[in-house]
Amino acid sequence: MTGVMKVKSSVFNILRIVRYKVINETVVIVFLSKFTKHIKQMNHRWTVLRNSWSLTKRHILFVTKYSDLKDIQKELLNSVEFVVFIGDFTKSIFFSDYKMDNIVCKDEMQDFRQHFKTKYKLSYMGHIFVIPHKQPTYDLLTEWLVCNIYSLQEITNINTIYFEPPHVVVFDMDSTLITDEDQVRIRDPAIYEALDALKKYNCVLCLWSYGDKEHVVNSLNKVKLDGYFKIILSGGRKAGEYQLNEEEDRYYNVYYESTPFYLNMTDVKNIPKSPRVVLWYLINHNIVLFKTLTLVDDLFDNNIYYDNFVNLSTCPVPVNDWDKWHTQIVRFIVNYDKKFKNY
């Protein structure tokens, strides 16, 4: 089992008293929300240390400061190619294997992944690791699969089922692939052929519906989409910790599960579909590395940190428009593979 760091959401009880008067709590929250949003949009100067002689490639260790590396044995550290943190690098005596670079980007995973892969000409990245007792508080680590550095060897030893890391495409179900009617229908018959085509582009297809398991199973069976997806997830709309309640469909080799994670996003109306959940199930299906992560969903709020987001229109009833959305998915994948063709 991989060492997955559970990051609990912080709950702040804000009470401000100025000259014996209580400031309206809502005003304080709105101010802090705007201030936090402004901070997130700022670019940061990330220090990247690269060990070209590392035993395993592409994995990244995030630390708060360079001196945190003293807590890790040299043998383990030699298995990490990249060490990343915000701040200056004080040249030290104890590690001379690193080459230092800088990346300027937002404290946000999508932006970081784009800049990082472009900088180092990598078509895919390894896993994200932290030191458990010194975990950084960077925003980009929230809602992402963050692993314990001491589980690195275990993760490295997983036998992946893909020779070349795939692209991962996560589909919503209701009002995306099927209609919102009581008697659900397929959105567009072109969907079947389009899903088959994506597999030829080396894509792993996943489905994540906020509906309950019975609704998901019955709907997929009715519109004959039950054999297309490697991973099927149900539930996860509410914030908090979910019990891992899984049921295996042995015929189709998929799972219908609730998300066993604390979700960090508690201050929004709709809880987004956290990549952390998707990545956790991928690694448990021996899909260890991937190139890109795409979300296809009719709800804008469901997107957070995905490399690509296809925000399609709703479909209360069938509509013949899938070619438009399929083209957006394929164009992103083709352009990406062309950009990183030799990497």
UniProtKB/Swiss-Prot annotation:
SUPFAM superfamilies, A to Z: HAD-like
Protein's UniProt name: Uncharacterized 41.0 kDa protein in P143-LEF5 intergenic region
Taxonomic lineage from the root: Viruses, Viruses incertae sedis, Naldaviricetes, Lefavirales, Baculoviridae
Residue ranges crossing the lipid bilayer per the database entry: none
InterPro entries the record matches: DUF705, HAD-like_sf, HAD_SF_ppase_IIIC
Organism of this sequence: Cryptophlebia leucotreta granulosis virus
